[in-house]
């Protein structure tokens, strides 16, 4: 696939930066950060424009907090000016992140999403005898910076854009607990960044193509790091799963225990329990829904 260049000029166009401001401010128009930025919007956008063009830009000013729904996650909220930057980049780069994604990956994509993924999965549940569910351990925290930078360089050739991507990527490192907390060098993208959603989706794109084109899996669906594989030959499916596990380990990822069942038994996926001819809320989703009532 031909790499794309000359995008920095489009990213730094004042109309694009203004659009990025409105996207970043959506739902937060009364916050102090938005108000401060808006009061000098022309000056602030010009400053951001010059910082992008010069490469002299500060990123990684995160506010950390935890959420517990449906499980504990560390969220990293970037500063408002940084969120404007993220939107400015993705307003322009979004279609180029889309180009090499397979049809059956459903996260962070216009016209896709959870319910389209469930609908597609239901077809597999009806058509095939076996289903395997794969889930990557601590996916966002395990993304290798060097590998991600290399993958982005296969999509984009603009050196200033790649420098900007790398600066955003290396502004964060995941923290792991091992007796005492310590930083793991060179891994992780922050949950909460708009850019992280695109980076994380792209990180597994080559794996998608490996599964579909080299292994020839009959039907395969991915929603970020949650994957379903379908087939009628259990032995073949087991062999394919071993090869996928090996492929993921090459890019620093490890799977949680794989679930391989007959489709008639059902499988949990994206908060639902899927059967050949019905889809139900799973137990955890039911409890979460009741708490919100």
Label the model's feature ranges.
Residues 1, 22-29, 66-68, 181-182, ...:
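Short acidic (Asp/Glu) and glycine-rich catalytic loops that position anionic groups and cofactors
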Residues 56-61, 217-221, 289-293:
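Short, conserved aromatic-histidine micro-motifs
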Residues 1-157, 172:
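Conserved two-metal-ion catalytic palm core of "right-hand" nucleic acid polymerases
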Residues 44, 51-52, 104, 109, ...:
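Conserved polymerase palm-domain catalytic core
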Residues 34, 190, 194, 273:
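Gly/Ser/Thr-rich beta-alpha loop segments that engage phosphate groups in nucleotides
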Residues 234-293:
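C-terminal polymerase-core module
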């Amino acid at each position: 696939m031909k790499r794309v260049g000359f995008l920095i000029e489009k990213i730094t166009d004042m109309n694009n930066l203004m659009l990025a401001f409105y996207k970043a401010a959506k739902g937060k128009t009364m916050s102090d950060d938005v108000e401060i930025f808006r009061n000098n919007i022309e000056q602030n956008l010009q400053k951001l424009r010059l910082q992008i063009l010069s490469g002299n830009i500060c990123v990684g000013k995160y506010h950390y907090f935890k959420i517990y729904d449906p499980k504990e996650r560390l969220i990293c909220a970037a500063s408002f000016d940084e969120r404007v930057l993220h939107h400015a980049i993705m307003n322009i780069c979004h279609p180029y992140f889309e180009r090499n994604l397979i049809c059956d990956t459903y996260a962070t994509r216009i016209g896709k999403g959870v319910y389209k993924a469930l609908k597609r999965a239901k077809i597999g549940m009806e058509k095939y005898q076996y289903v395997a569910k794969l889930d990557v351990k601590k996916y966002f925290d395990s993304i290798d910076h060097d590998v991600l930078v290399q993958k982005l360089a296969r999509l984009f050739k603009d050196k200033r854009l790649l420098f900007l991507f790398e600066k955003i990527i290396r502004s964060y490192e995941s923290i792991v607990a091992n007796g005492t907390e310590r930083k793991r060098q060179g891994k992780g993208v922050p949950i909460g960044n708009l850019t992280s959603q695109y980076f994380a989706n792209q990180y597994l794109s080559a794996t998608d193509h490996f599964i579909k084109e080299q292994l020839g899996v009959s039907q395969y669906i991915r929603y970020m790091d949650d994957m379903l594989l379908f087939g009628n030959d259990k032995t073949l499916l087991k062999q394919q799963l071993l090869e996928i596990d090996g492929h993921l380990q090459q890019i620093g990822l490890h799977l949680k225990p794989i679930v391989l069942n007959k489709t008639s038994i059902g499988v949990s996926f994206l908060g639902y329990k899927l059967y050949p001819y019905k889809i139900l809320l799973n137990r955890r989703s039911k409890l979460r829904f009741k708490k919100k009532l």
